[in-house]
Every structure is written in structure tokens, then in C-alpha cells.
Amino acid sequence: MSDISKASLPKAIFLMGPTASGKTALAIELRKILPVELISVDSALIYKGMDIGTAKPNAEELLAAPHRLLNIRDPSQAYSAADFRRDALAEMADITAAGRIPLLVGGTMLYFKALLEGLSPLPSADPEVRARIEQQAAEQGWESLHRQLQEVDPVAAARIHPNDPQRLSRALEVFFISGKTLTELTQTSGDALPYQVHQFAIAPASRELLHQRIEQRFHQMLASGFEAEVRALFARGDLHTDLPSIRCVGYRQMWSYLEGEISYDEMVYRGVCATRQLAKRQITWLRGWEGVHWLDSEKPEQARDEVLQVVGAIAG
């Protein structure tokens, strides 16, 4: 697309970053100054009843800066990148039609990628094919299926660990249904985002600072009643660790504690470690991201001013 035609597109802002980097605080600050409406880009914040462990904006923050795509699913329900793209595009169109600018804030990089680049034409899940794969895994083990994937799609096999049955079975399922590999199909992108996007990433300047913030926040969550929140989910009886909601960082570790599998101290240790690993993956995504403007979360006023400098011209 030429620069002239891109300039004629409606404007949007991406505010990305690892967990505990100060994204929400900056987004709320920007909403006071710019004509923006906020859309959450977070695969955990979509769930109702999961507030403390996801660091969901509190009632006061949401009053000052409402977020769209919060609390839109029950924890028993799945929500895909395709679901997000559909919903986000609808919200963006609604915001643009009102003469305002969508500001998408969050840390689920897969959602940002799906929104920006479109989605590959992957086949829908087939319960029969999936059942055959799981039966084979039960008989031969996931290592055997991983070797099978290596033969048909070595690129995907190098990326997927043998102990990751969800992604492994999906890669094989795609091949069995379509006759094409996951790698081949994901190289075919869908429709690009029809917006002129200003992209920002916020993070502390050092990994040590981010690690400190993550540990502090995890302990703050515990002090705020995180255990009671997960106990309420646990008591429902219809939720389990195979669900995306309960696999969320922090929730999975607390669930293991409630099931008596690990001690409280081990839960805290694992929860902090898992959150740090999540942040590392998010930063790895962002380092390979094109056209992103980096902001230092230890200097919030400077970060705000840098965003205003870049996008201020679009606010008139």
C-alpha cells in the first residue's frame, strides 16, 4: 500500500508490552488527553470472575477509562484469535464512526498479530480427527506423534515441544484435514488491518526491574484476595486445567495448590517464575516487531509525552 493511500486510512494506536509494564496506567493517562477509546488485547482479561490474578483494571480505572472486550466470556468458554479479530474490528469500526481513535492496549501478542496481518486460512477443528490423534497418543505416546510431525512438517516440529499436546495435535490435525502443513498454511496471511497504526511498546529498561515488578505484583495479588478468587472458580466444579482460562499464568499454579499437588510456597515460586517466563516471551515477540516505538515504563511522564509527540498530530 502506498504512503498516500495509507494516510487516508482511519487512525489506530497499539500500546503493547510485557505483563507488569504499566500499559494500563499509560493508556488511562492518554485517554485524558487524546480522543481515544480503549480496547483490551488480553486473552485473560476477557474472562468474567478473573479480576485479581489478571490485574484487570479496577472499577475506578474503568470509570475513568472504559475498556472494551473485558468480561466477555465465562471461564468455561474458549476464545480464539479469530474471535478476537472479529470483535476488535467491530469495536474499532464503532469507535471510528464516532469520530474517535481506537487505542488497543494489552500483552497478547498473537491477538495483535492476527489483527494487524489477518489470519491464515486454517481448517476448523474436526472432533473425529482430533479423537484419532489422541487415541494414537494414548497408545504410542506424544513423542511418537512428534516424530510423525517431523516427517511432514519439520519447521513446525522444531517449534513445538513434544510435551505440548495441544499444539502438536493441532499441527497434525491441520495436515490430516487439509493435506497441507501448518507451516505452509500460516505463510498465507489474511486481510491486513485497514487502519493507519501507530505502534508503541512499553517495558522497563532492564530485565531485573521487570522481574522485581512482577514479583511485587504477584504478592500484591495474593494480599488482595487472589486465593479466594480462584477458590470460587475451583468450587464451581465445571472448570479444569485443560481450559485456556485456568491455564492462565497464576491461576494454573494456584489451582495446583488448591488440588493439594504443591505447597503454598511452591505455588508462589512457580507463579512468579511462570509470569517472568510469560514476560520474556512477550518481549521476544516485541523485539522482532516491525515499526514499534519503545517507551521506558520507569519514566511514565516521558513515555506519555513521547506518545503525544508521535500521535499528537492525529488528535486534532
Swiss-Prot record:
Binding residue positions for ATP: 17-24
Organism superkingdom: Bacteria
Gene Ontology MF terms in the entry: ATP binding; tRNA dimethylallyltransferase activity
Site positions for Interaction with substrate tRNA: 108, 130
Gene Ontology biological process terms from the UniProt entry: tRNA modification
UniProt enzyme class: transferase
Cofactor: Mg(2+)
Keyword Hydrolase appears in the UniProt entry: no
UniProt entry tagged with the keyword DNA-binding: no
Region annotation (Interaction with substrate tRNA) ranges: 42-45, 166-170, 247-252, 280-287
Entry EC number(s): 2.5.1.75
Cross-referenced Pfam families: IPPT
UniProt xrefs under InterPro entries: Dimethylallyltransferase, IPT, P-loop_NTPase
Catalytic activity entry: adenosine(37) in tRNA + dimethylallyl diphosphate = N(6)-dimethylallyladenosine(37) in tRNA + diphosphate
Binding positions (substrate): 19-24
Subunit structure: Monomer.
Family: Belongs to the IPP transferase family.
Name of protein: tRNA dimethylallyltransferase
UniProt source species: Escherichia coli O1:K1 / APEC
